[in-house]
Amino acid sequence: MLRHAIETNVQIFTKFLVISASAVGIGYARKLFDQRPQRDDSFLSNSMIKAYLETRQYPDSFALYRDLRKETCFAPDNFTFTTLTKSCSLSMCVYQGLQLHSQIWRFGFCADMYVSTGVVDMYAKFGKMGCARNAFDEMPHRSEVSWTALISGYIRCGELDLASKLFDQMPHVKDVVIYNAMMDGFVKSGDMTSARRLFDEMTHKTVITWTTMIHGYCNIKDIDAARKLFDAMPERNLVSWNTMIGGYCQNKQPQEGIRLFQEMQATTSLDPDDVTILSVLPAISDTGALSLGEWCHCFVQRKKLDKKVKVCTAILDMYSKCGEIEKAKRIFDEMPEKQVASWNAMIHGYALNGNARAALDLFVTMMIEEKPDEITMLAVITACNHGGLVEEGRKWFHVMREMGLNAKIEHYGCMVDLLGRAGSLKEAEDLITNMPFEPNGIILSSFLSACGQYKDIERAERILKKAVELEPQNDGNYVLLRNLYAADKRWDDFGMVKNVMRKNQAKKEVGCSLIEINYIVSEFISGDTTHPHRRSIHLVLGDLLMHMNEEKYNW
């Protein structure tokens, strides 16, 4: 009886077909569809076309439409065309989209608001904004979705002025979707003033709204504004936490990133995902919080996230930066799949841990399996620098061009440091003079340090002028030259440098140290009088000093 109902009633058959497509598979649904003697029913045919769309088999939705037009009396309706325009948008089939638009004209559906909105959205997704605007202008009636489709297209293409103008012209009450889209456009362009104006205008804000603004403030390095919004959020999801944690790491505040990660675990029931782990691991690496890094590694294994290449790469990078190079190597060897970033992290790990030869050997192996990039070559030159391998460093620096890679300022800086450490000061200075970039403060400070090491006052004087222009308040540059003058008993010049330091208000960067105990990272700053436990710290330090004196420890 049920079988008879399915076979004779097209409504029941269509519902059975849709259930079969999702529960059994699209192939089985198509087999049922093809066995049907009458396939030109619009409800049935549209359902089969939509089933292809929902299973992301976009070419098959077009193929079925063409077959139905050739083999049956199927007459497409507005539902057919809205489904097919969406299929075009998602598959980015421009040629199919153009053909479809001509079919829409042919069957007289251009005046249909839903079909025309689909056409506008399709062209906007293709980046063909001229076609999208023409279709929009020809619409006799437009919905809020029509306006949103065109505005979103302009935003994606970076035409924010046109998007903003349309946004202001919208006759409808704007909903949160279009506000979020417009705000996201401003955020991506770095225009946080306009983004904030929209944010303050909104009467209803979603988690996406708040998170978009937080992400924007993190991008422009206004981490305090980002945190104020984060703290003011009425509701947070995992994406919000990930954005704020990542923002701290991105803005060189790793301890705050770790604290927030621990706060998330202590105050919410949210489980970290791969994005959380990828956000917090750089902070762990920067602070040397190895115990927390090991916890992350165990968590990744427990949640089966270690199948993801990016996560494994971040874990091995963390271990290598925390000095656990053997653990890093074990993870690298066990990775079922490696990307260029994985090789780069392992080579750089060897370089950081002073194993230059292992880094270069791995690089040679990498060249058999992967094509090195600029980051690879920086890791290789860094390894040569740490290992004092001047000739190999020169070789790989010059080979970069033959490999089709352009040396960036970081590569030049590493070479200057390598040559300076080796005492090749003339070659290093020539490299600074002839490099296709203006040298930055790091390069000049590195070279000044080499001049100090090899007592080359003349070169130090030349370079200091450039260094002072770039970083007038960096006391380290002055101190190097001042010490050289003192060693040479040039007391007038020594005094002159001191006066320049005073005039430029050069200050010594305050030293700090970090220690991790029970997953908590504590920071100690030289001369800090604001630490909440300073009395206890000073008492313990006093006891330690007394003990060292009693043991006649030579410190």
From Swiss-Prot:
UniProt-annotated stretches for the region Type E(+) motif: 519-549
Listed Pfam families: E_motif, PPR, PPR_1, PPR_2
N-terminal signal peptide: none
GO molecular function: RNA binding
Example GO BP: RNA modification
InterPro entries referenced in this protein's UniProt entry, alphabetically: E_motif (IPR046848), Pentatricopeptide_rpt (IPR002885), PPR_At4g14850-like_plant (IPR046960), TPR-like_helical_dom_sf (IPR011990)
Similarity annotation: Belongs to the PPR family. PCMP-E subfamily.
PANTHER family: PENTACOTRIPEPTIDE-REPEAT REGION OF PRORP DOMAIN-CONTAINING PROTEIN (PTHR47926:SF437), PENTATRICOPEPTIDE REPEAT-CONTAINING PROTEIN (PTHR47926)
Protein name (Swiss-Prot/TrEMBL): Pentatricopeptide repeat-containing protein At2g44880
Protein source organism: Arabidopsis thaliana (Mouse-ear cress)
Lineage of the species this protein comes from: Eukaryota, Viridiplantae, Streptophyta, Embryophyta, Tracheophyta
